[in-house]
Structures are given as C-alpha cells and as structure tokens.
Amino acid sequence: MLISRPRGTSDLLPGDTARWQRVEAVIRDLCRVYGYGEIRTPLFEATELFQRGVGDITDIVEKEMYTFTDKGGRSLTLRPEGTAPVTRAYLENGLHAVPQPVKLFYVGPMFRYDRPQAGRYRQFHQFGVEIFGAADPAADAEVIALAMHFFDRLGLAGLELHLNSVGCPGCRAVLRRKLADYFEPRADELCANCRGRLRKNPLRLLDCKEERCREAGRGAPVPVDYLCPECGGHFGRVQRYLDLLGISFKLNPCLVRGLDYYTRTAFEILVPGGGAQDAVGGGGRYDGLVSAIGGPAVPGVGFALGLERTLLLWSRQAGEEVLPQGPVVFIATAGETEETATVLLSGLRAAGVPADREYTGRSLKAQMKFAAKLGARWVIIVGKDELEAGEVILRDMGAGLQTRVSLGEVVERLRRDARG
C-alpha cells in the first residue's frame, strides 16, 4: 500500500519550486533594499514561548498547535507563527543590547492543525519582517509599505489594505468591559466559540466570521472609540505616513487580529470577495511582546504574509508558467562513448555551464527528443567516428543547425555562449 503525505501538506515539485524561487528572490531583494537582515529560527520551540507570547486563550494555542513531549520530558511545539520565535532569538542572542532598531526578516514553514482548504495547509510558509526598538509610527508605515511593495513587485492587483488600532493595554481594559456589557445580553445569539471568547477575551468577538456573530455585533463598541490620546495620536500619524507614501487603505474598526500580542496598529491585506479566507497577510505593533517573554520593554512592529495564498493568487491573476531551468547543454552519446561524455560533462560544469548527459542507453533519436523536452539550448553529440577525428557534433537546438567542433575547444566555446 502506498504511503501518502500527511493531510494538509504538499509536495513541491520542480515546476512548483521554480515559482517559489521567483517569489523568494523578490523577498530577498526587497529586504536588502529596505535594510532587513535574514534570521532563521528552529522549527520547534518551548511550548511556553507561544503560551506567553501568542496568548494561551487564542485559537492558535488552544486548538491548532502541534505539541509534543520529548524524551527529556520537555514540552515542545512546532512553530505556528514566526514573530514569537524571532523575538525569543532577538533576546537570547543579545540583539536588544546593540544599537536599535534591529530589522529582521524570515521565510520558512509554520505548522497549525487547521482544516485544509485552498491556500491553507497544516504546514505552510510565511514571509515576515520585524522591527525591534522603534516606537515611531513611521516604522508601522514602513512595514506596511514593504508588504504592499512585495505584492506590487509580483504584479498582483486589486488587494485592499485594512487598518485599525487596538490601542494599548489601558485602552483595551475599558473596551473589554464595554464589550462584555454589550454582548452578555446577546450571548444566545453567538456561536459556541464566541460564547467562550465572551468570558475569556471579548475583543475577539469583533473578529468572528460567522454571520450570526457579525449580525449580533453590528452595534458593538469598537477599539477606535476608546483610544487614549497617545494611541489616538499614534494612529493618526500612521495614517498620515501612509497618505504621504501614496498607500490606499480602508479603516476597519472591527479588525483586531487573532493574536494577543498586538497593540495599537493592526492591519490586514485582503483579496476583495475572497470569502472567509480572503486575507493574504497582516501584522501590526506588539510593544509588549518582548517583555512578555522575559525581556525589557522594547517596542516592535512587523507582518507575516502567507506564501501559499500569495502563490495561489499569483497563478490566478498572472497565469504565468515558470518552468524549471533545464541544462544549457545536453550531451548525447552514440556508440561506446560514455567515458568521453563523462569527462566532457565534468569540464562543462567546472566552467560554470549548466549541463547534463544521457544515462539510460536510449537511441540517439530518443536522446534528441529528450533534450528538446528539457529545453537544452545546445546538444553535444559524442559519436565514435567523430571522436576518432578528435571532434564532436554541436547542435543548436533553436536554429536546428549543427557543426563539427574540436573536442578540445567545445567547452570554451559553450562557456562563452553561456555567459552571453
């Protein structure tokens, strides 16, 4: 019986990875331009990191984490998101002691036990950035600008930026009381999840996608109505910077995000009409996260974008087929010439020319068809008669022309051609 991949995962074949590499190249180039250094953290962390950082009453921690106990009795969790691990690494490696701000980016897999659907997997990939040590609202605008620039570089159109402020802990304490007072008489109108949230974190009721909860919350208090003067001023400056940068946005008073560490700015980037899973990414400010996991009070802001969703949207909009890069040169053999083909192949690769050779013993005609399928620009035909004359046949696959070339000169000729 064939063993299948686990549900909610995917295999990326060469045709897929060519598209991923294009996206990753855009990420790395943009982060270089914006001044972010790459960070890579472990795939698993202490479970406590996410309980303290993400929030132990969030859906992620309560329902979606892959948690296990290792042989030493330690509780470990496959990372469900990237910000808490990057924050832990920032602290543990002393980056809080160097001149601030510190600007980091990451690309890698995350893990959540969620219901698989289009663009949503149990192992999924995120591109994220974090700025530590910058409380200025201009930093909020910068990470938003970087995210929008990323989608623009991919040629994706029609995305909407939704913006809100969830305030500071002082603002939210007042808002929570107001929300509890509003929703408690309407508890019977809420879904089961929201009835639980009402007792634990009523702010999350604003973010529910269930129609019955949306209807019940139409007159509910919203964060922007309870911002303190400092948070209100910060939010106004973020909007001003976005206006200066020419970045359009929609104010969404019910946007709260699903992680407890957010303070002040919260944003999402959405595909209009995309349904419940229309967000391709989001982020915001998290000024209390560093201290929540044992560090000093350091402000932070960042985002995370879902790469599977981004690639799904890219394929729908662009329809561009990115083929895997085949060899520039394919070496075909005719007769007992395999040893010469092997030495020639090694010489081409040493010269930096992408090359491959025949390994299956098929006919010369079949080899030529295979080379065409690979997209090879040139084919070197190593035949017994030609070798006796110290030559090979070099075929230009695009022009359909071929010529005899000295065996000692063919590598240098193709090296020059490959470099253009």
Curated annotation (Swiss-Prot):
UniProt-listed GO biological process terms: histidyl-tRNA aminoacylation
Entry EC number(s): 6.1.1.21
Gene Ontology molecular function terms on file: ATP binding; catalytic activity, acting on a protein; histidine-tRNA ligase activity; transferase activity
Catalytic activity: tRNA(His) + L-histidine + ATP = L-histidyl-tRNA(His) + AMP + diphosphate + H(+)
One Pfam family of this chain: HGTP_anticodon
Record NCBIfam families: hisS
Similarity comment: family membership: Belongs to the class-II aminoacyl-tRNA synthetase family.
HAMAP family, per database record: His_tRNA_synth
Protein name: Histidine--tRNA ligase
